[in-house]
Amino acid sequence: VDPNRRVLTDYSIVIANDKITALGPSHELENLYRDATTVIDAAGKVVLPGFVSAHNHVGYAVFRGRAEDVGYAPTHRLYLPMSGVITNSEREVIGALAVTELLRGGVTTILEMEEDAELFAPFIESSGIRAFIGVMVNDVNLDALASGQTVFDDTVRTQQLSQAIGLAERWHGRSGGRIQAVMAANGLSMSSPALLKGLRAAADDLGLRVSIHLGFGERELVESVHHRAQFDYATDCGMLGTDVIAVHCYDVDETEIDMLAKSGTSLAHCPHMNQFRGEVAPIQAMQSKGMQIGLGIDNYFSDYFEVLRSCIASARIRAHDPEVLSAQDALALGTIDAAAVMGLDHEIGSIEIGKKADLQIIDMRRLGLTPTNDPVATLVYHGHGKDVETVIVDGQVVVSNGRVQTADEDALITQASQAATAAWDRFSQRYGSFVAPAPN
Protein backbone atom coordinates (compact mmCIF):
# COMPACT_ATOMS: atom_id res chain seq x y z
CA VAL A 1 0.00 0.00 0.00
CA ASP A 2 2.66 2.46 -1.08
CA PRO A 3 1.64 5.78 -2.72
CA ASN A 4 1.28 3.99 -6.07
CA ARG A 5 -0.66 1.04 -4.59
CA ARG A 6 1.64 -1.38 -6.38
CA VAL A 7 1.18 -5.14 -6.24
CA LEU A 8 4.67 -6.59 -6.53
CA THR A 9 5.13 -10.15 -7.75
CA ASP A 10 8.13 -12.38 -6.99
CA TYR A 11 9.62 -9.80 -4.64
CA SER A 12 11.47 -10.31 -1.39
CA ILE A 13 11.64 -8.19 1.75
CA VAL A 14 14.74 -7.82 3.90
CA ILE A 15 14.27 -6.99 7.58
CA ALA A 16 17.02 -5.88 9.93
CA ASN A 17 16.09 -5.37 13.56
CA ASP A 18 12.69 -3.62 13.42
CA LYS A 19 12.81 -2.12 9.92
CA ILE A 20 12.46 -3.02 6.27
CA THR A 21 15.92 -2.43 4.81
CA ALA A 22 15.54 -3.78 1.28
CA LEU A 23 12.74 -4.57 -1.15
CA GLY A 24 13.29 -5.98 -4.62
CA PRO A 25 13.03 -8.88 -7.06
CA SER A 26 13.58 -12.17 -5.26
CA HIS A 27 16.32 -13.42 -7.57
CA GLU A 28 18.38 -10.30 -6.81
CA LEU A 29 17.92 -10.18 -3.04
CA GLU A 30 18.40 -13.92 -2.55
CA ASN A 31 21.89 -13.57 -4.00
CA LEU A 32 22.69 -10.49 -1.92
CA TYR A 33 21.44 -11.93 1.37
CA ARG A 34 22.52 -15.57 1.27
CA ASP A 35 23.68 -15.33 4.89
CA ALA A 36 20.33 -14.16 6.27
CA THR A 37 19.72 -15.50 9.77
CA THR A 38 16.06 -16.34 9.15
CA VAL A 39 14.27 -16.98 5.86
CA ILE A 40 10.48 -17.18 5.58
CA ASP A 41 9.33 -18.93 2.41
CA ALA A 42 6.37 -16.94 1.08
CA ALA A 43 6.04 -18.68 -2.29
CA GLY A 44 2.37 -18.82 -3.25
CA LYS A 45 1.57 -16.36 -0.49
CA VAL A 46 0.67 -12.69 -0.19
CA VAL A 47 2.50 -10.28 2.10
CA LEU A 48 0.45 -7.31 3.30
CA PRO A 49 1.11 -4.49 5.75
CA GLY A 50 -0.30 -5.39 9.14
CA PHE A 51 -3.80 -4.10 9.73
CA VAL A 52 -4.16 -0.97 11.86
CA SER A 53 -7.24 -0.65 14.08
CA ALA A 54 -7.75 2.95 15.17
CA HIS A 55 -10.36 2.05 17.78
CA ASN A 56 -10.63 -0.87 20.22
CA HIS A 57 -12.15 -1.90 23.54
CA VAL A 58 -10.57 -5.31 24.14
CA GLY A 59 -12.27 -5.88 27.49
CA TYR A 60 -15.67 -5.67 25.83
CA ALA A 61 -15.14 -9.10 24.27
CA VAL A 62 -17.09 -10.36 27.29
CA PHE A 63 -20.24 -9.06 25.55
CA ARG A 64 -19.70 -11.18 22.44
CA GLY A 65 -22.95 -12.95 21.63
CA ARG A 66 -24.86 -10.86 24.19
CA ALA A 67 -24.82 -7.27 22.93
CA GLU A 68 -25.24 -7.54 19.18
CA ASP A 69 -29.06 -7.63 19.34
CA VAL A 70 -29.50 -5.07 22.12
CA GLY A 71 -29.30 -2.03 19.83
CA TYR A 72 -27.27 1.12 20.40
CA ALA A 73 -24.33 1.07 22.82
CA PRO A 74 -26.18 -0.65 25.69
CA THR A 75 -24.61 1.33 28.51
CA HIS A 76 -27.52 1.02 30.93
CA ARG A 77 -28.55 -2.54 30.08
CA LEU A 78 -25.17 -4.25 29.74
CA TYR A 79 -22.04 -2.16 30.20
CA LEU A 80 -22.71 -0.54 33.58
CA PRO A 81 -24.39 -3.61 35.12
CA MET A 82 -21.54 -5.88 34.02
CA SER A 83 -18.95 -3.50 35.48
CA GLY A 84 -20.51 -4.15 38.87
CA VAL A 85 -20.17 -7.93 38.76
CA ILE A 86 -17.08 -8.79 36.71
CA THR A 87 -13.70 -9.01 38.47
CA ASN A 88 -10.43 -7.47 37.33
CA SER A 89 -8.88 -10.88 36.80
CA GLU A 90 -11.81 -11.91 34.60
CA ARG A 91 -11.58 -8.75 32.53
CA GLU A 92 -7.82 -9.12 32.24
CA VAL A 93 -7.93 -12.61 30.75
CA ILE A 94 -10.83 -11.78 28.43
CA GLY A 95 -8.92 -8.73 27.18
CA ALA A 96 -5.82 -10.86 26.69
CA LEU A 97 -7.82 -13.26 24.54
CA ALA A 98 -9.10 -10.35 22.43
CA VAL A 99 -5.57 -9.03 21.85
CA THR A 100 -4.42 -12.52 20.91
CA GLU A 101 -7.25 -12.85 18.40
CA LEU A 102 -6.35 -9.51 16.84
CA LEU A 103 -2.71 -10.50 16.40
CA ARG A 104 -3.69 -13.90 15.04
CA GLY A 105 -5.82 -12.17 12.40
CA GLY A 106 -3.12 -9.86 11.07
CA VAL A 107 -3.78 -6.77 13.21
CA THR A 108 -0.42 -5.31 14.18
CA THR A 109 -1.50 -1.96 15.67
CA ILE A 110 -4.44 -1.02 17.89
CA LEU A 111 -5.73 1.99 19.79
CA GLU A 112 -7.09 0.59 23.04
CA MET A 113 -9.22 2.95 25.13
CA GLU A 114 -11.12 1.70 28.13
CA GLU A 115 -12.07 2.77 31.63
CA ASP A 116 -9.45 0.44 33.10
CA ALA A 117 -7.08 0.27 30.14
CA GLU A 118 -4.01 -0.15 32.33
CA LEU A 119 -5.37 -3.55 33.33
CA PHE A 120 -4.61 -4.75 29.80
CA ALA A 121 -1.34 -2.87 29.27
CA PRO A 122 1.07 -5.56 30.55
CA PHE A 123 -0.35 -8.23 28.25
CA ILE A 124 -0.54 -5.83 25.33
CA GLU A 125 3.16 -5.09 25.77
CA SER A 126 4.20 -8.73 26.16
CA SER A 127 2.07 -9.85 23.20
CA GLY A 128 4.23 -7.88 20.79
CA ILE A 129 1.40 -5.87 19.25
CA ARG A 130 1.88 -2.15 18.58
CA ALA A 131 -0.55 -0.08 20.61
CA PHE A 132 -1.79 3.26 21.77
CA ILE A 133 -3.37 2.82 25.22
CA GLY A 134 -5.53 5.28 27.12
CA VAL A 135 -7.93 5.49 30.04
CA MET A 136 -11.39 6.33 28.66
CA VAL A 137 -12.53 9.00 31.08
CA ASN A 138 -15.93 10.31 32.13
CA ASP A 139 -16.98 12.11 35.29
CA VAL A 140 -20.61 11.17 35.76
CA ASN A 141 -21.95 9.73 38.99
CA LEU A 142 -22.62 6.13 37.96
CA ASP A 143 -25.34 5.56 40.54
CA ALA A 144 -27.27 8.50 39.14
CA LEU A 145 -26.57 7.40 35.57
CA ALA A 146 -27.96 3.95 36.31
CA SER A 147 -31.28 5.62 37.09
CA GLY A 148 -31.16 7.69 33.91
CA GLN A 149 -29.80 10.93 35.38
CA THR A 150 -26.59 12.74 34.40
CA VAL A 151 -24.82 14.23 37.41
CA PHE A 152 -21.17 15.25 37.22
CA ASP A 153 -18.91 14.45 40.15
CA ASP A 154 -15.83 16.51 41.04
CA THR A 155 -14.20 13.63 42.91
CA VAL A 156 -14.67 11.27 39.97
CA ARG A 157 -13.22 13.88 37.62
CA THR A 158 -10.08 14.28 39.70
CA GLN A 159 -9.63 10.52 39.95
CA GLN A 160 -10.19 9.95 36.23
CA LEU A 161 -7.74 12.62 35.11
CA SER A 162 -5.14 11.34 37.56
CA GLN A 163 -5.60 7.81 36.27
CA ALA A 164 -5.32 8.90 32.62
CA ILE A 165 -2.21 10.98 33.22
CA GLY A 166 -0.66 8.26 35.37
CA LEU A 167 -1.06 5.64 32.65
CA ALA A 168 0.49 7.99 30.11
CA GLU A 169 3.47 8.71 32.34
CA ARG A 170 4.04 5.02 33.07
CA TRP A 171 3.51 3.56 29.60
CA HIS A 172 4.20 6.11 26.88
CA GLY A 173 7.28 5.12 24.89
CA ARG A 174 7.67 1.64 26.37
CA SER A 175 9.24 -1.18 24.34
CA GLY A 176 11.19 1.18 22.14
CA GLY A 177 8.12 3.25 21.34
CA ARG A 178 5.94 0.29 20.33
CA ILE A 179 3.66 1.20 23.23
CA GLN A 180 2.35 4.77 23.32
CA ALA A 181 -0.30 6.56 25.31
CA VAL A 182 -3.40 8.42 24.20
CA MET A 183 -5.80 10.67 26.06
CA ALA A 184 -9.33 9.33 25.66
CA ALA A 185 -12.87 10.29 26.62
CA ASN A 186 -16.05 8.23 26.52
CA GLY A 187 -18.16 10.92 24.90
CA LEU A 188 -19.64 14.37 25.28
CA SER A 189 -22.77 13.59 27.28
CA MET A 190 -20.81 11.81 30.03
CA SER A 191 -18.07 14.44 30.29
CA SER A 192 -18.19 17.84 31.97
CA PRO A 193 -16.44 20.86 30.45
CA ALA A 194 -13.89 20.74 33.27
CA LEU A 195 -13.05 17.11 32.50
CA LEU A 196 -12.65 17.59 28.76
CA LYS A 197 -10.64 20.78 29.17
CA GLY A 198 -8.45 18.99 31.70
CA LEU A 199 -7.96 16.14 29.25
CA ARG A 200 -7.10 18.63 26.53
CA ALA A 201 -4.52 20.32 28.77
CA ALA A 202 -2.96 16.97 29.71
CA ALA A 203 -2.70 15.95 26.05
CA ASP A 204 -1.00 19.24 25.24
CA ASP A 205 1.42 18.95 28.16
CA LEU A 206 2.37 15.36 27.30
CA GLY A 207 2.29 15.72 23.52
CA LEU A 208 -0.36 13.03 23.07
CA ARG A 209 -3.28 12.47 20.76
CA VAL A 210 -6.90 12.55 21.94
CA SER A 211 -9.58 10.02 21.03
CA ILE A 212 -13.29 10.43 21.77
CA HIS A 213 -16.62 8.99 20.62
CA LEU A 214 -18.43 11.72 18.67
CA GLY A 215 -21.61 11.90 16.61
CA PHE A 216 -22.85 8.49 17.72
CA GLY A 217 -26.47 9.10 18.60
CA GLU A 218 -26.17 11.35 21.65
CA ARG A 219 -27.17 14.60 19.92
CA GLU A 220 -30.29 15.27 21.99
CA LEU A 221 -28.66 14.12 25.21
CA VAL A 222 -25.69 16.46 24.73
CA GLU A 223 -28.05 19.36 24.11
CA SER A 224 -30.10 18.45 27.17
CA VAL A 225 -27.10 18.05 29.48
CA HIS A 226 -24.83 20.83 28.21
CA HIS A 227 -27.30 23.18 26.47
CA ARG A 228 -25.03 23.26 23.42
CA ALA A 229 -25.10 21.56 20.04
CA GLN A 230 -22.82 18.51 20.10
CA PHE A 231 -20.00 19.87 17.95
CA ASP A 232 -20.20 23.35 19.43
CA TYR A 233 -19.66 21.74 22.82
CA ALA A 234 -16.81 19.64 21.43
CA THR A 235 -15.19 22.78 20.05
CA ASP A 236 -15.62 24.63 23.35
CA CYS A 237 -13.77 21.84 25.16
CA GLY A 238 -10.92 21.33 22.68
CA MET A 239 -12.26 18.04 21.35
CA LEU A 240 -11.79 18.95 17.69
CA GLY A 241 -8.34 19.44 16.17
CA THR A 242 -5.47 17.97 14.21
CA ASP A 243 -4.49 15.67 17.08
CA VAL A 244 -8.04 14.44 17.76
CA ILE A 245 -9.37 11.07 16.62
CA ALA A 246 -13.17 11.19 16.51
CA VAL A 247 -14.81 7.77 16.68
CA HIS A 248 -17.99 6.78 14.76
CA CYS A 249 -19.51 10.11 13.55
CA TYR A 250 -22.49 8.47 11.87
CA ASP A 251 -24.92 11.04 13.29
CA VAL A 252 -23.49 14.16 11.64
CA ASP A 253 -24.96 16.71 9.27
CA GLU A 254 -23.21 18.72 6.55
CA THR A 255 -22.38 21.60 8.87
CA GLU A 256 -20.83 19.23 11.40
CA ILE A 257 -18.79 17.50 8.69
CA ASP A 258 -17.46 20.93 7.74
CA MET A 259 -16.52 21.56 11.38
CA LEU A 260 -14.69 18.25 11.57
CA ALA A 261 -12.86 18.82 8.31
CA LYS A 262 -11.88 22.44 8.95
CA SER A 263 -10.54 21.56 12.39
CA GLY A 264 -8.35 18.79 10.95
CA THR A 265 -10.01 16.13 13.11
CA SER A 266 -9.46 12.54 11.94
CA LEU A 267 -12.06 9.77 11.97
CA ALA A 268 -11.81 6.23 13.33
CA HIS A 269 -14.52 4.63 11.18
CA CYS A 270 -16.02 1.46 12.68
CA PRO A 271 -18.36 0.22 9.94
CA HIS A 272 -18.82 -3.31 11.23
CA MET A 273 -20.05 -2.16 14.65
CA ASN A 274 -22.04 0.70 13.13
CA GLN A 275 -23.93 -1.72 10.89
CA PHE A 276 -25.12 -3.72 13.88
CA ARG A 277 -26.58 -0.48 15.23
CA GLY A 278 -28.30 0.27 11.94
CA GLU A 279 -26.01 3.19 11.16
CA VAL A 280 -23.70 4.17 8.31
CA ALA A 281 -21.17 6.99 8.56
CA PRO A 282 -21.06 9.37 5.55
CA ILE A 283 -17.40 8.75 4.79
CA GLN A 284 -17.64 9.79 1.12
CA ALA A 285 -18.86 13.23 2.18
CA MET A 286 -16.08 13.40 4.77
CA GLN A 287 -13.41 12.35 2.28
CA SER A 288 -14.65 14.95 -0.19
CA LYS A 289 -13.94 17.56 2.50
CA GLY A 290 -10.41 16.23 2.97
CA MET A 291 -10.87 14.37 6.26
CA GLN A 292 -8.34 11.70 7.20
CA ILE A 293 -10.21 8.43 7.79
CA GLY A 294 -9.02 5.03 8.98
CA LEU A 295 -10.78 1.88 10.12
CA GLY A 296 -11.32 0.52 13.61
CA ILE A 297 -12.70 -2.78 14.86
CA ASP A 298 -14.33 -1.43 18.06
CA ASN A 299 -15.22 -4.08 20.59
CA TYR A 300 -16.90 -7.50 20.25
CA PHE A 301 -15.29 -8.44 16.93
CA SER A 302 -11.78 -9.47 15.93
CA ASP A 303 -11.79 -10.32 12.19
CA TYR A 304 -10.46 -7.29 10.33
CA PHE A 305 -11.43 -8.72 6.96
CA GLU A 306 -15.06 -8.42 8.05
CA VAL A 307 -14.42 -4.76 8.81
CA LEU A 308 -13.05 -4.22 5.30
CA ARG A 309 -16.13 -5.80 3.75
CA SER A 310 -18.49 -3.85 6.01
CA CYS A 311 -16.73 -0.66 5.01
CA ILE A 312 -17.33 -1.35 1.32
CA ALA A 313 -20.90 -2.61 1.72
CA SER A 314 -22.06 0.24 3.95
CA ALA A 315 -20.52 2.88 1.67
CA ARG A 316 -22.20 1.39 -1.39
CA ILE A 317 -25.57 1.10 0.34
CA ARG A 318 -25.42 4.71 1.51
CA ALA A 319 -24.41 5.92 -1.96
CA HIS A 320 -26.76 3.54 -3.83
CA ASP A 321 -23.75 2.90 -6.03
CA PRO A 322 -22.21 -0.59 -6.43
CA GLU A 323 -18.88 0.85 -7.57
CA VAL A 324 -18.16 3.17 -4.66
CA LEU A 325 -15.07 2.24 -2.61
CA SER A 326 -12.91 -0.46 -4.19
CA ALA A 327 -11.04 -3.30 -2.52
CA GLN A 328 -7.86 -1.24 -2.86
CA ASP A 329 -9.58 1.72 -1.19
CA ALA A 330 -10.72 -0.43 1.72
CA LEU A 331 -7.28 -1.97 2.17
CA ALA A 332 -5.76 1.50 2.29
CA LEU A 333 -8.30 2.58 4.92
CA GLY A 334 -7.25 -0.41 7.03
CA THR A 335 -3.51 0.12 6.70
CA ILE A 336 -1.83 3.36 5.61
CA ASP A 337 -4.89 5.57 6.21
CA ALA A 338 -5.53 4.17 9.69
CA ALA A 339 -1.84 4.65 10.42
CA ALA A 340 -2.20 8.31 9.37
CA VAL A 341 -5.15 8.74 11.74
CA MET A 342 -2.83 7.65 14.54
CA GLY A 343 0.05 9.79 13.28
CA LEU A 344 2.11 6.73 12.38
CA ASP A 345 1.99 6.70 8.57
CA HIS A 346 5.66 7.66 8.40
CA GLU A 347 6.49 4.43 10.28
CA ILE A 348 3.86 1.80 9.41
CA GLY A 349 0.95 1.07 7.07
CA SER A 350 2.84 0.20 3.89
CA ILE A 351 5.69 -2.01 2.78
CA GLU A 352 8.46 0.47 2.06
CA ILE A 353 12.16 0.65 2.79
CA GLY A 354 12.82 2.44 6.07
CA LYS A 355 9.45 1.65 7.60
CA LYS A 356 8.79 -0.64 10.53
CA ALA A 357 8.53 -4.32 9.67
CA ASP A 358 4.84 -4.78 10.58
CA LEU A 359 3.64 -7.44 8.15
CA GLN A 360 1.20 -10.30 7.66
CA ILE A 361 1.55 -13.27 5.33
CA ILE A 362 -1.39 -15.22 3.91
CA ASP A 363 -1.19 -18.52 2.03
CA MET A 364 -3.51 -18.20 -0.98
CA ARG A 365 -3.35 -21.92 -1.79
CA ARG A 366 -6.40 -22.80 0.25
CA LEU A 367 -10.14 -23.22 -0.05
CA GLY A 368 -11.93 -19.89 -0.32
CA LEU A 369 -8.96 -17.98 -1.73
CA THR A 370 -8.53 -19.88 -5.00
CA PRO A 371 -8.54 -18.95 -7.84
CA THR A 372 -6.61 -15.78 -7.10
CA ASN A 373 -7.18 -13.55 -10.10
CA ASP A 374 -6.50 -10.36 -8.14
CA PRO A 375 -4.83 -10.92 -4.76
CA VAL A 376 -6.09 -7.68 -3.19
CA ALA A 377 -9.71 -8.15 -4.26
CA THR A 378 -9.61 -11.84 -3.35
CA LEU A 379 -8.38 -11.14 0.16
CA VAL A 380 -10.64 -8.15 0.83
CA TYR A 381 -13.79 -9.89 -0.38
CA HIS A 382 -13.04 -13.48 0.62
CA GLY A 383 -10.31 -13.49 3.26
CA HIS A 384 -10.65 -14.16 6.97
CA GLY A 385 -8.43 -13.61 9.96
CA LYS A 386 -7.98 -17.37 10.24
CA ASP A 387 -6.28 -17.34 6.83
CA VAL A 388 -3.33 -15.35 8.19
CA GLU A 389 -0.30 -17.59 8.58
CA THR A 390 2.51 -15.30 9.78
CA VAL A 391 2.51 -11.94 11.54
CA ILE A 392 5.56 -9.76 12.15
CA VAL A 393 5.58 -6.69 14.40
CA ASP A 394 8.66 -4.52 14.87
CA GLY A 395 10.64 -7.15 12.99
CA GLN A 396 9.65 -9.91 15.43
CA VAL A 397 7.61 -12.95 14.37
CA VAL A 398 4.61 -12.99 16.69
CA VAL A 399 2.46 -15.43 14.71
CA SER A 400 3.95 -18.46 12.96
CA ASN A 401 2.08 -21.22 11.15
CA GLY A 402 -1.17 -19.68 12.34
CA ARG A 403 -0.26 -19.78 16.03
CA VAL A 404 0.49 -16.81 18.27
CA GLN A 405 4.03 -17.20 19.62
CA THR A 406 3.79 -14.74 22.51
CA ALA A 407 0.84 -16.29 24.36
CA ASP A 408 -0.67 -19.69 25.12
CA GLU A 409 -3.75 -19.65 22.89
CA ASP A 410 -5.28 -22.82 24.32
CA ALA A 411 -4.89 -21.69 27.91
CA LEU A 412 -6.35 -18.27 27.13
CA ILE A 413 -9.37 -19.80 25.41
CA THR A 414 -10.06 -21.96 28.45
CA GLN A 415 -9.44 -19.21 30.99
CA ALA A 416 -11.45 -16.56 29.12
CA SER A 417 -14.36 -18.94 28.65
CA GLN A 418 -14.40 -19.74 32.36
CA ALA A 419 -14.11 -16.05 33.26
CA ALA A 420 -16.99 -15.03 30.99
CA THR A 421 -19.21 -17.85 32.26
CA ALA A 422 -18.58 -16.85 35.87
CA ALA A 423 -19.25 -13.17 35.16
CA TRP A 424 -22.48 -13.84 33.28
CA ASP A 425 -23.68 -16.22 35.98
CA ARG A 426 -23.35 -13.42 38.53
CA PHE A 427 -24.97 -10.98 36.12
CA SER A 428 -28.02 -13.18 35.58
CA GLN A 429 -28.33 -13.91 39.29
CA ARG A 430 -28.44 -10.18 40.03
CA TYR A 431 -30.68 -9.07 37.16
CA GLY A 432 -32.69 -12.20 36.43
CA SER A 433 -31.63 -12.30 32.77
CA PHE A 434 -28.68 -11.54 30.53
CA VAL A 435 -29.95 -8.00 29.87
CA ALA A 436 -30.60 -5.60 32.73
CA PRO A 437 -33.85 -3.60 32.73
CA ALA A 438 -33.75 -0.13 31.20
CA PRO A 439 -33.64 2.78 33.70
CA ASN A 440 -36.91 4.50 34.54
Positions of predicted regions on the chain:
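Alpha-helical scaffold segments that flank or form the walls of functional sites
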Residues: 64-129, 160-176, 417-419
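Active-site microenvironment of metallo-dependent hydrolases
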Residues: 1-11, 16-21, 26, 32, ...
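Histidine/acidic-residue-rich catalytic or RNA/ligand-binding cores of hydrolases
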Residues: 218-231, 256-261, 278-287, 301-316, ...
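His/Asp/Glu-enriched, well-ordered alpha-helical/loop segment
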Residues: 236-243, 284-366, 382-384
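Active-site glycine- and acidic-residue-rich loops that bind
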Residues: 111-114, 182-197, 275-277, 341-343
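Active-site gating loops and adjacent loop-to-helix segments of metal-dependent hydrolytic enzymes
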Residues: 62-93, 135-155, 218-243, 266, ...
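Metal-coordinating catalytic core of metallo-dependent amide/deamination hydrolases
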Residues: 121-255
